[in-house]
Amino acid sequence: SAPNLGTPTLPSPGFRRTKMGDVEIISVLDGIARRPLGEEFVKNAPLAEVKALLTSQGLPTDYIDVPFTPFVVIAGGRKVLIDTGLGEFGGPNAGKLLENLRAAGVPASDIDTVLISHFHGDHINGLRNKAGELAFAKAKVMVPAAEYAFWMDDAKMAAAPAGQKGAFENARCTFSAMGPDMLVQFAAGAEVVPGIRSVAAYGHTPGHTLFEVTSAGQSFFYLADLTNVPSLFARNPDWAVTFDMDAEAARKVRREVFARVTSSKSLVGGFHFPFPAFG
């Protein structure tokens, strides 16, 4: 039987605001998954080495807590949500995004644009509930064209390993009923809304995309899944998490972006960073 790893405590309140120039950025927690730490989590490092790094930071070694934190950007009258969490599909410790948005004063009905970094379930499942209804009914949903092309490609789905078929089905189910008036694809590097530019960071998935928010000469980088939990992967950028589809491309872009945000002293936010997920 699986060991009882306990349940992570969800922070309260589940949102954190910061101002940058004329922009307000709010991290809004969807939940935290506690997963047993096994050999497979870091694909290219022995478990003993992974555990030693956790121990050196005073962190537990039998499990890993993976938070899910979408971000809201309020700029120029726009209310933009970046990624959506697991919604009703993530068990009792997830699906808190809608209540935390309300608590932060930005109910789902106020969101006019949803930006999606990539199509893994913890980023897109919050778009709909189990009945299939849209959580952000008034919003345009903007997705990377390269990501959309990959997951909607029947040949890619047919060739995918068995463990990946479900992700293809999930992506298709999530986006299938969205018409062209709602679902918008954007090219790599496009300015998706005024003041927010997309940054291609392919590797974790074939169309994995970051977003850079600029205001008054300052920048905030939403790093999506460039690095999973930073206690492991920010300290060892060459380590590959089990979820990286192209580990070498992910490693390369991780090092490039880390160098960029370090030299520019940008504020960063990471979907799987410890809450409040700013860095």
Where are these regions (language model features)?
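Active-site metal-binding loops of divalent metal-dependent hydrolases
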Residues: D30-G31, T84-G87, F119, A146-E147, ...
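A short acidic, glycine-rich active-site loop
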Residues: A52-I64, G105, K165-F168, V241-R254
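Cap/insert and terminal regions of metallo-dependent hydrolase folds
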Residues: T214-G279
